[in-house]
Amino acid sequence: MKGKLKKFYNLVEALETLPSIGKKSAGRLAFHMVLHSPMDALKLAHAIEDAVSSIHRCTQCGGLSEDELCYICSDELRDRSSLCLVESARDIYVIEESGEYHGLYFVFESLNERILANLKEMIKNNGVQEIIFAFTPSMQSDATMLYIEDQLQEFHLHFTKIAQGVPTGVHLENVDMLSLSKAISERVKI
């Protein structure tokens, strides 16, 4: 049957490449697109093509942008004294959705001299006074934070990291030991 519906199976295989989409989900999506909403499928295809051809990395922070600078880096009302280091451009989106942070960001995806030089340039150009680490909690992240802090000593910055511990609504039995340990040792007065 695969040879007879080659284009359908090509669609299923393409959908399977997306995160969290397995073979069954890809098949359901393909059937829905082809049989029930072909116009929506064409709109989706156009939106994907438009996004892929128009979106690239911000030249300053490494986040997503349709221009040279992203909307955050080009916003003069942002708090330029605060710089949040994240591991991926997606992390910027997640933090922005919280509505709690109003400073700048820098995507620190890997430890290399080019990224470190870009980070130093951003600190100089914006008068950054505080670095906030928003990395996934791990021993490797802790080591990376210490390394970055050491490399940025010349700027006399204030270094902080986002709080971590027990997530809201999660039973203690389901919390990993590192998170529970940090939550206990970094407890706050109520």
Swiss-Prot record:
Keyword match Phosphoprotein: no
Domain Toprim per the UniProt entry, residue ranges: 81-167
GO function terms (MF aspect): DNA binding; zinc ion binding
Signal peptide limits: none
An individual GO BP term: DNA repair
Keywords, in A-Z order: DNA damage, DNA recombination, DNA repair, Metal-binding, Zinc, Zinc-finger
Keyword Lipid metabolism part of the UniProt annotation: no
Zinc fingers (C4-type) by residue: 58-73
Gene3D superfamilies noted in UniProt: 3.40.1360.10, RecR Domain 1 (1.10.8.420)
A Pfam entry, by short name: Toprim_4
HAMAP family noted in UniProt: RecR
Similarity section: Belongs to the RecR family.
Role of this protein: May play a role in DNA repair. It seems to be involved in an RecBC-independent recombinational process of DNA repair. It may act with RecF and RecO.
UniProt name for this protein: Recombination protein RecR
The species this protein was found in: Nitratiruptor sp. (strain SB155-2)
